[in-house]
């Protein structure tokens, strides 16, 4: 491949250069307000390795080692690593510290004052290290530094030299669990004063398949738990001097150390300090028999397939059976016991009795049941069959199903009776019901009607009339399913109304998921590809069944709210018939009483059964420092986790009250945070004309994310089809954090001016991606090429004034009017390295191993003065409008731009 650089026009002014600030009325030398230190004066920016800002140089032993009594020394390595990672991205940020350095830490005692206090009070214990607060002016730090979206959260400063096995592995990885507050208020009154949520964002699994980077596994059957609170031994427990008792860090009870903790299964002595539970914050146990009420059941997949006229016309039936046929080997079957059942549905139920392959002369038999009120199962013993033993006959059936129903003219779909039949088929063992439908359920129990959208869309009645469950069957049925360990996944693909708001309840309360494919037509290869890719990844995904998850907190900490797809069995226990691998959960925490300890703990335990016939326990333990300083609380806020927590609360308000109330809540949350910060933490104010809008540096992206959230399809005002809005709400309430953020604030790449190495493999054979740009039209050039990624779809946007050479290199056509438009793939252009790099980037963005999503690609171009009247002008105009809604920093859909939003917040907080 030739690496000769193709030079296209590039912007003369880039963000970060002085002239861009002059565009917004900011002088060239406005790096910091007058009388305030520059970036180079901020301790955080000049931190030396091994030194916490404000703590001075570390003490050293004669041999160069750190003294043992410095409680922050081991944790400092983590802080230094995260500082190193963030320094480059923070270089372009416009920090605006407090008015003078004496107030840098918000009226903390100066060194002389500290010395005097210590002399008065006697020998004082060294203060524990805490994150420091660095204020900025949001209106000056503009455009917002979106590189912060990829930064790690503020470090959790914990004295690792105080635990049995000092190790960085004892600190919980943020991809498993994130706390909105990495310094916990010691009292509920302080927590309320902050106006910040105290929540945990929990992602128990990081990959679709369990064999990728699994956590350490204890296979010896040794499980040590506190006899009072039932928490599991973890890195933060303590042993007494003789090592015979251990102190629980959750409830502070001393427990006897079992003798088997120091012995191997073969009765030889072992070193307890090498055990995984004392070294790692995330660990998994192979559970003994007492953790099982029964033998782990086989994995069972029951497919309810729509064979009505709609499913035939749009090609969904053929696409489904072909994909299932091609992926039978991908179904998890580690123990060889996986079972399968297929049920076709229109206005009746079509069962299939599938004989085993060794039964010569026996063929698959179809049995029809038309009495939906009293449906029975003709031959239950041959309806749910072993995948291995009946493999050939299953393949034969999947090949014949499209032929059997190819002339079907029935436009009915009896989903309710089909669900009841599937329930009766699998109630003894449990399992997963997968529904594939192109038709609104319109006959039998649970039949639905098309709602009146015209009169309710965009009105205060929208939530209650269009986004609530239309029939209680879809909630009560999930209660039955949870009792027998059945979950439900929905794949809805149609050009017609499907009532996603109602049907999504099936997945929501059973631990499943609803996938929506509006306007689906298998005749469009892009639609068929997206459905097939996602359906195939869903089939191959590892799952756990018979799952319960509980979070235990140390003294004063209690979980009170739960968000995600599961059934809340009790006040602190979440039940999952099936736990998929591509979901995340948010737990809200309250403080029942004041916390006296310097550190608090939360432990999440998940009891589950695997497809390997094993019962396991996954334990995640999080340690957090506590504080009675609101400044230290704000300095340790994880702005991304806070966004996730507020998003879940906004979803609840959208579904329970109104969309207007949800938007009001989002904006009010930002106002409350800014007002509290100004009232409690801003030491000095300037005159009214130059009054800044202060917030701490670690939260500078929070207002942007919340503002962008109001413009998301789930919340934005205006006319949005109810199925699309309901699908967006359903997606956001369960998607892992990094995809939630991309859904809120889309990632945009500039392709026409990307460096030579971008789009090509690095030393690890990973395609290098461009640096994202701000989601604003001011970031665009009329002659540029841009790629927008919202986590669900991709948009390749060509500027209307692009040079012919750029168009030819990208699409292989000499004229911009000839470039492809709409939902399609980038054509392969031989001997065009630029075209190959574009396709490499798109493929990299689609290559996920933690979610099943396969983004559709939409190609469009901007309008230009030379645009002729074209047949697809309406489609192109709609596509431009849709793509422009992703420029969330701008004025779109009647909402204000981000700068105006900040100005509005400044006015409100100044009252």
Swiss-Prot record:
Q: Where is this region: Disordered?
A: 108-130
Per its record, what are the GO molecular function terms?
signal sequence binding; SNARE binding; zinc ion binding
Q: Which residues form the signal peptide?
A: none
Q: Which residues bind Zn(2+)?
A: 226, 229, 248, 251
Q: Which family does it belong to?
A: Belongs to the SEC23/SEC24 family. SEC24 subfamily.
Q: What does this protein do?
A: Component of the coat protein complex II (COPII) which promotes the formation of transport vesicles from the endoplasmic reticulum (ER). The coat has two main functions, the physical deformation of the endoplasmic reticulum membrane into vesicles and the selection of cargo molecules.
Name the record gives this protein: Protein transport protein SEC24-1
Organism field: Naumovozyma castellii
Q: Source gene?
A: SEC241
